[in-house]
């Protein structure tokens, strides 16, 4: 699995086996970001259930200004941090361009961010999807994680 476009194109992403972790394929990310086009430029990304970080890292590689990654599994988040370091180095981005939050997504969404995000990736594990779906969207809206021009992508 690799970054499919932008400054870090071709950089490999590591993965760790964990229940429910199914990284987005390179082909799917490439199609998605091709359809988004320049809308990713200078955006603030929120990558929920980040896993390997492939969505947020793809966005950073393609010109997003910042990505916040939320992953509750500590072991998975360690691999995520390694992936972030590799992409930031390859794309010549500062470490401040990425932030990792090791926390349950629903608990995080009870807070209110300093600023809303322009691009939100929502890719929960399949086994949690039915339990989370309504709560996730409600909290994203209620607690101002999004604004009227935000783009929310749910897989």
Task: Specify the residue positions occupied by each region the protein language model found.
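Class I S-adenosyl-L-methionine-dependent methyltransferase catalytic core
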Residues: 1-155
């Amino acid at each position: 699995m690799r970054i499919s476009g932008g400054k870090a194109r071709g950089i490999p992403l590591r993965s760790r086996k964990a229940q429910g972790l199914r990284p987005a394929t390179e082909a799917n990310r490439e199609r998605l970001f091709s359809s988004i086009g320049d809308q990713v430029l200078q955006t603030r990304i929120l990558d929920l259930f980040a896993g390997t970080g492939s969505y947020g890292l793809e966005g950073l590689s393609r010109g997003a200004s910042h990505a916040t990654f939320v992953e509750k599994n500590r072991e998975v988040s360690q691999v995520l941090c390694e992936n972030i370091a590799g992409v930031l180095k390859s794309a010549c981005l500062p470490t401040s361009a990425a932030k990792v939050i090791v926390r349950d997504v629903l608990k995080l969404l009870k807070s209110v961010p300093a600023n809303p995000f322009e691009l939100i990736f929502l890719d929960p594990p399949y086994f949690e999807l039915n339990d989370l779906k309504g709560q996730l969207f409600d909290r994203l809206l209620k607690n101002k994680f999004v604004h009227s021009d935000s783009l929310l992508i749910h897989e």
